């Protein structure tokens, strides 16, 4: 994945800078999301690495996307096809999404808990993270009963493991060392 990110980063950055300049971040996010889905389609995948020329591949890809992609988006597709990089479109979309969140001072946080969190608990976690990260936080909550109790919060590079299973694992490691 690191290699895909390295390849995708210049395309994502160029698309993001252009979207900022044209005040079209949301529409570009939608376009890239759609293009990424097309590139991951089981019918499309073999064509991306097939025997088509770059211009044929770009034309086919643009035709499949139809009106979902504007002229500038089509230009990005053509450049990526010329460089044989259409298969990294999902990574381009992910990086674009990260750039967009960074620009908007937002972060997505994953909260895994042993039991379902109440709205009040989610609000408390969100407020604490917003204070700590100085960003607006969007929570993605899920339940994993194997945690026994507590939560694991992941926001970017930050990981807070407040689960009983995590504490037991850390205690076990200390006892073994």
From Swiss-Prot:
Subcellular location field: Cell inner membrane
Database matches in Pfam families: OSCP
One annotated GO molecular function: proton-transporting ATP synthase activity, rotational mechanism
Membrane topology according to the record: Peripheral membrane protein
Signal peptide annotation: none
UniProt cross-references to InterPro entries, sorted A to Z: ATP_synth_OSCP/delta_N_sf (IPR026015), ATPase_OSCP/dsu (IPR000711)
GO cellular component: plasma membrane; proton-transporting ATP synthase complex
Transmembrane segments annotated in the record for this chain: none
SUPFAM superfamilies: N-terminal domain of the delta subunit of the F1F0-ATP synthase
Keywords per UniProt: ATP synthesis, Cell inner membrane, Cell membrane, CF(1), Hydrogen ion transport, Ion transport, Membrane, Transport
Alphabetical list of HAMAP family matching this protein: ATP_synth_delta_bact (MF_01416)
Family: Belongs to the ATPase delta chain family.
Task performed by this protein: F(1)F(0) ATP synthase produces ATP from ADP in the presence of a proton or sodium gradient. F-type ATPases consist of two structural domains, F(1) containing the extramembraneous catalytic core and F(0) containing the membrane proton channel, linked together by a central stalk and a peripheral stalk. During catalysis, ATP synthesis in the catalytic domain of F(1) is coupled via a rotary mechanism of the central stalk subunits to proton translocation. This protein is part of the stalk that links CF(0) to CF(1). It either transmits conformational changes from CF(0) to CF(1) or is implicated in proton conduction.
Subunit structure: F-type ATPases have 2 components, F(1) - the catalytic core - and F(0) - the membrane proton channel. F(1) has five subunits: alpha(3), beta(3), gamma(1), delta(1), epsilon(1). F(0) has three main subunits: a(1), b(2) and c(10-14). The alpha and beta chains form an alternating ring which encloses part of the gamma chain. F(1) is attached to F(0) by a central stalk formed by the gamma and epsilon chains, while a peripheral stalk is formed by the delta and b chains.
Stated name of the protein: ATP synthase subunit delta
Organism, scientific name: Shewanella loihica (strain ATCC BAA-1088 / PV-4)
Gene from which this protein is expressed: atpH
């Amino acid at each position: 994945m690191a290699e895909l990110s390295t390849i995708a980063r210049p395309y994502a950055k160029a698309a993001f800078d252009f979207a900022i300049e044209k005040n079209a971040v949301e529409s570009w996010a939608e376009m890239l999301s759609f293009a990424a889905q097309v590139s991951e389609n089981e019918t499309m995948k073999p064509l991306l690495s097939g025997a088509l020329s770059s211009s044929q591949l770009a034309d086919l890809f643009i035709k499949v996307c139809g009106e979902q992609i504007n002229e500038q988006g089509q230009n990005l597709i053509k450049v990526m096809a010329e460089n044989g990089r259409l298969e990294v479109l999902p990574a381009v979309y992910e990086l674009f999404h990260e750039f967009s969140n960074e620009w908007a001072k937002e972060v997505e946080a994953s909260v895994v808990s042993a039991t379902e969190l109440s709205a009040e608990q989610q609000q408390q976690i969100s407020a604490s993270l917003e204070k700590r990260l100085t960003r607006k936080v969007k929570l993605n909550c899920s339940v994993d009963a194997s945690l026994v109790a507590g939560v694991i919060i992941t926001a970017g590079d930050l990981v807070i493991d407040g689960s009983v299973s995590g504490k037991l694992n850390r205690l076990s490691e200390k006892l073994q060392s």
